[in-house]
Amino acid sequence: MSGNTYGKLFTVTTAGESHGPALVAIVDGCPPGLELTLEDLQRDLDRRKPGTSRHTTQRQEPDEVEILSGVFEGKTTGCSIGLLIRNTDQKSKDYSAIKDLFRPAHADYSYHHKYGIRDYRGGGRSSARETAMRVAAGAIAKKYLASQGIVIRGYMSQLGPIEIPFKTWDSVENNAFFSPDPDKVAELEAYMDQLRRDQDSVGAKITVVAEGVMPGLGEPIFDRLDAELAHALMSINAVKGVEIGAGFACVAQRGTEHRDELTPQGFLSNNAGGILGGISSGQPIVAHLALKPTSSITTPGRSIDIDGNPVDVITKGRHDPCVGIRATPIAEAMMAIVLMDHLLRHRGQNADVRVSTPVLGQL
């Protein structure tokens, strides 16, 4: 009812606010017997956590996850997995001056109209702080999917006006931007340093790829795999657009260019992003997501207070000048949660389906 749960067979429910005591999650539907440790979850949380470079928020949260249930002697039991991350570095006083004001482009105004009450400290439930639990839950899904030969990885493909070509996965984990091109890192750092001096923010584009996905995942018509991915990725804070495969570029393509022709040796292209008719084709699943510039900046912005009076708002506190810098692990997590759910759903209905047609890769 309140939109805090995702999934049908593999479900993730989260709770918690930016300046509350903790974030929690319940992950249900994970098959029993999966070897799972704190390190499996912490690895991705460390990739997302704040304060890891001068280009992100300086809020210092260790994001140390606790497993409360559903794991015994290092293996999942099949029962619900309870997760907890304690908040340790809140500075709620930073927001006392704006508790009766609406920050431009934030959820303050819309939350106020929906609920009649809102947690003004750091955005409360609408804060990207909430995504830490998505990453923890997604790490469980990634671990299981990896046991089935499915690998999910992401990278930053654009920061502001700077496009980042894909060169190598080896570069992605070796810089603060998740850049696949090591030669672009110095340019990205210089751009962010100038942005900070300008007291401004910028958007970004993230690409996330799933390899090893078997054909057949997806539930037409309303639960198409691409529709579910778009739903999940659009639910990430600050995401304003999602593309699958060629995405909006298909508008300028001709049919002879866009269609992914098949040969006995494999597909000749992947404009569909690994999904045909809402069902996985066996090719890599490719999604791109656009994140808006951070709305919390120190440059004054026009707004109103709760009585409708005009005000200028200056947002204090510690904020990411580009939320996209830490979004890659979040995008990976949401794609993993979707694929995990659909893998279990496919198994439940179609486990006995056998076809003689070979599974094609991409040339």
From Swiss-Prot:
One Gene Ontology MF term: chorismate synthase activity
InterPro entries: Chorismate_synth, Chorismate_synth_AroC_sf, Chorismate_synthase_CS
Any one GO biological process: aromatic amino acid family biosynthetic process
Catalytic activity of the protein: 5-O-(1-carboxyvinyl)-3-phosphoshikimate = chorismate + phosphate
Entry-linked Pfam families: Chorismate_synt (PF01264)
Enzyme Commission code: 4.2.3.5
Taxonomic superkingdom: Bacteria
Amino acids binding FMN: R125, S126, S127, N237, A238, G277, K292, P293, T294, S295, S296, R318
Cofactor note: Reduced FMN (FMNH(2)).
Pathways involved: Metabolic intermediate biosynthesis; chorismate biosynthesis; chorismate from D-erythrose 4-phosphate and phosphoenolpyruvate: step 7/7
Cofactor: FMNH2
Record keywords: Amino-acid biosynthesis, Aromatic amino acid biosynthesis, FAD, Flavoprotein, FMN, Lyase, NADP
CDD domains: Chorismate_synthase
Amino-acid positions noted as binding NADP(+) in the UniProt annotation, renumbered to this chain: R48, R54
One GO CC term on file: cytosol
Stated family: Belongs to the chorismate synthase family.
Function: This reaction introduces a second double bond into the aromatic ring system.
NCBIfam families (alphabetical): aroC, PRK05382.1
Stated name of the protein: Chorismate synthase
Classification lineage: Bacteria, Pseudomonadati, Pseudomonadota, Gammaproteobacteria, Pseudomonadales
